[in-house]
């Protein structure tokens, strides 16, 4: 028997009955006329739907334009308006697909002559005209045959292909905005006027149809849209800042590294870049002293090991395979460059019998790993194919697991604080659909990590934000993900802590317990920086190249005003080097202001200026990157001050601890 009413639960917990066929707009009007006027969509049990849709049983929310969820609708609708604008301006242009993406939207177009950046202001102007018309979005459901016939008649061949790709039995929705229409799953807001004017078209790019290089090249137009003009302005400001801070540009200006076609996705480190990289490794190495054994596992291993670990089945397409043209015994073997360090560390743990008294065993490695990334995804230091991972694996008992996770957390947070990151978010990623290991093992791991997550939040007294990422765990275990916020508000996921009951079982790893029985250890994967290359890129962008003195690739330049001060300048440089600083000299016959400007471009943090007076007084004049101020002090004071400032945070703590004893 057909139901004649629909039960809806409202955010305040109240439940009301509505007649079948009641729309979202009807429900909004039943609450208040003002709410109905502000409404742009509804959400039924969390799913966004059109206001014009008939409601179904569940929890209902009326979504207004100010709602965070409305931003996706604003961007989606803006993409449709952009497509209409393009076809009004250039009749005959075919529209293909136009999804919402992070911070905006895009649409791909098939046009004889590709769009150029000069076309964007013209399209924007037409979009504002269409939005001002405030035409309603209306939805129709068409048959497959009708849709193909209509789009074919319009010359929209790509739309015909999209219609063919829609599974049988699935509704084929057509959305109108005035006379213009498009194939779309929806939902949309009530009218084009609700989009507002806080949008901007950003750039044009080429894109193959369906992402396949065998298909025609289309023109993609990217745009962004926001609730308010203030939000748009802030976003554009962040983009401008990000461009100024782009680590690829800074890498060139500071002479740190480069990439080239012969080695796609691998870094050519220059002297200064390698110096800063090694400073980062040295710092991390000191932070592990006393707690970890630093090890090194082979770069190339037989595929049988990766088959045992499960990587060959789950990750093979991202691995670099190596075949050996050697003697007969090797001819048929297939090897792979390691994409991860964990299987190698298990082999080290298994080498020799382990007692429960030796646990936890903590193995750390600054391991070079290789993972295939499509060429289009490569992005400077942030996305590479070969990188160094500050990896560690802890082998412990079930009872030690929670304490080890908390110990790792303390180390991770301390490292991030040393590098100047104050805002941290820790999220627990739970089991994905595709995974290895039994549900029982996953239940155990997730229960422990949920408890640890609660402890992290409590111990931080709310300073560390926490959350859950359902289904985002690795295929072999749940994990914590640590996300940093940088100087311009961008978020970077870096550290991970992952409990793994599965890999030790696959490799038959065990220890001897107090009853002389074999027991399987818990394995905890952890990384703090993650990719050292990527973390260095994040640091460069966070500080806009103006690195803290302790990790700056070149800490001081001693520059002379006159050749009469060159001998004194050499003495100053030598004193600073003896104090542990990285120093270069500039005795060229150039004006001092020219020298200062030139070294500022390469982000030298401290310039020590010496002239005739400084040589006579045995003093120096210190200039700082980004400041017009000049500080005069004696040479002894300068050496003491700069050497103290250039000391790494962990070494300062160690020094202060010794002084307090």
UniProtKB/Swiss-Prot annotation:
It catalyses: tRNA(Thr) + L-threonine + ATP = L-threonyl-tRNA(Thr) + AMP + diphosphate + H(+). It is an enzyme of class 6 (ligase). Residues 246-548 are annotated as: Catalytic. One of its GO terms (cellular component) is cytosol. Binds 1 zinc ion per subunit. The keyword Protein biosynthesis applies. GO terms for molecular function: ATP binding; metal ion binding; threonine-tRNA ligase activity; tRNA binding. One of its GO terms (biological process) is threonyl-tRNA aminoacylation. Pfam families: HGTP_anticodon (PF03129), TGS (PF02824), tRNA-synt_2b (PF00587), tRNA_SAD (PF07973). Residues 1-65 form the TGS domain. It is found in: Cytoplasm. Its EC number is 6.1.1.3. Keywords: Aminoacyl-tRNA synthetase, ATP-binding, Cytoplasm, Ligase, Metal-binding, Nucleotide-binding, Protein biosynthesis, RNA-binding, tRNA-binding, Zinc. PROSITE patterns: AA_TRNA_LIGASE_II, TGS. Its cofactor is Zn(2+). Disulfide bonds: none annotated. Its main location: cytoplasm. Zn(2+) binds at residues 342, 393, 525. Homodimer. Catalyzes the attachment of threonine to tRNA(Thr) in a two-step reaction: L-threonine is first activated by ATP to form Thr-AMP and then transferred to the acceptor end of tRNA(Thr). Also edits incorrectly charged L-seryl-tRNA(Thr). Belongs to the class-II aminoacyl-tRNA synthetase family. This is Threonine--tRNA ligase. It comes from Rhizobium meliloti (strain 1021) (Ensifer meliloti). The gene is thrS.
């Amino acid at each position: 028997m057909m139901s004649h009413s629909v039960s809806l639960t409202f955010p305040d917990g109240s439940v009301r009955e509505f007649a079948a066929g009641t729309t979202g707009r009807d429900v909004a009007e039943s609450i208040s006329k003002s709410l109905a006027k502000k409404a742009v969509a509804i959400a039924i049990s969390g799913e966004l739907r059109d206001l014009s849709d008939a409601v179904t049983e569940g929890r209902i929310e009326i979504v207004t334009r100010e709602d965070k969820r409305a931003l996706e609708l604003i961007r989606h609708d803006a993409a449709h308006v952009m497509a209409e604008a393009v076809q009004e301006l250039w009749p005959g242009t075919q529209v293909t697909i136009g999804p919402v993406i992070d911070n905006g939207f895009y649409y791909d177009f098939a046009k004889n002559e590709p769009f150029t950046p000069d076309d964007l202001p013209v399209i924007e102007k037409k979009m504002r005209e269409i939005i001002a018309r405030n035409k309603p979005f209306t939805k129709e459901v068409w048959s497959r045959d009708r849709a193909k016939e209509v789009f074919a008649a319009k010359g929209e061949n790509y739309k015909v292909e999209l219609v063919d790709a829609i599974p049988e039995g699935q509704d084929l929705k057509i959305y109108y905005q005035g006379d213009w229409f498009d194939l779309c799953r929806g939902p949309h807001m009530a009218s084009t006027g609700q989009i507002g004017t806080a949008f901007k078209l950003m750039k044009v790019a080429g894109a193959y149809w369906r992402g396949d290089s065998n298909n025609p090249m289309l023109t993609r137009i990217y745009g962004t849209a926001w609730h308010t003009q203030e939000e748009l302005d802030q976003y554009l400001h962040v983009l401008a800042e990000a461009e100024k801070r782009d680590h690829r540009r800074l890498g060139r200006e500071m002479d740190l590294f480069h990439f080239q076609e012969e080695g796609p996705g691998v870094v050519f480190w220059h002297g200064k870049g390698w110096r800063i990289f090694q400073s980062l490794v040295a710092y991390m190495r000191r932070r592990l002293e006393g707690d970890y054994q630093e090890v090194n596992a082979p770069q190339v291993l037989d595929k049988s090991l990766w088959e045992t670990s499960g990587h060959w089945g789950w990750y093979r397409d991202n691995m670099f395979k190596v075949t050996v043209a050697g003697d007969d015994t090797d001819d048929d073997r297939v090897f792979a460059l390691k994409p991860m360090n964990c299987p190698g560390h298990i082999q080290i743990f298994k080498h020799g019998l382990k007692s429960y008294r030796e646990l936890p065993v903590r193995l750390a490695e600054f391991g070079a790993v290789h993972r295939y990334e499509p060429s289009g995804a490569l992005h400077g230091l942030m996305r590479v194919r070969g990188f160094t991972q500050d990896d560690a694996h802890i082998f412990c008992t079930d009872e030690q697991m929670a304490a080890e996770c908390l110990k790792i957390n303390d180390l991770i947070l301390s490292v991030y604080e040393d590098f100047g990151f104050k805002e941290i978010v820790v999220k627990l990623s739970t089991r994905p659909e595709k995974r290895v290991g039994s549900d029982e093992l996953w239940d155990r791991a997730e229960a422990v990590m949920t408890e640890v997550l609660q402890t992290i939040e409590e111990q931080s007294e709310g300073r560390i934000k926490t959350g859950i990422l359902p289904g985002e765990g690795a295929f072999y275990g749940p994990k914590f993900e640590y996300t940093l916020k940088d100087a311009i508000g961008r978020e970077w996921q870096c550290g991970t802590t992952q409990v793994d009951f599965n890999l030790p079982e696959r490799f038959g790893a065990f220890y001897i317990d107090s009853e002389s029985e074999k027991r399987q250890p818990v394995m905890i994967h952890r990384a703090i920086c993650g990719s050292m290359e990527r973390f260095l890129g994040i640091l460069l962008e966070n500080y806009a190249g103006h690195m803290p003195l302790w990790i700056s690739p070149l800490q001081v330049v001693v520059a002379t005003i006159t050749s009469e001060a060159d001998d004194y300048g050499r003495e100053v440089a030598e004193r600073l080097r003896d104090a542990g600083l990285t120093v270069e000299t500039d005795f060229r016959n150039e004006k001092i202001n020219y020298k200062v400007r030139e070294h500022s471009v390469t982000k030298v943090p401290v310039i020590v200026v010496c002239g005739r007076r400084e040589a006579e007084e045995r003093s120096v004049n210190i200039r700082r990157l980004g400041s017009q101020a000049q500080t005069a002090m004696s040479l002894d004071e300068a050496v003491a001050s700069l050497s103290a400032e250039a000391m790494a945070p962990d070494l300062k703590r160690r020094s202060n601890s010794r002084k307090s004893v």
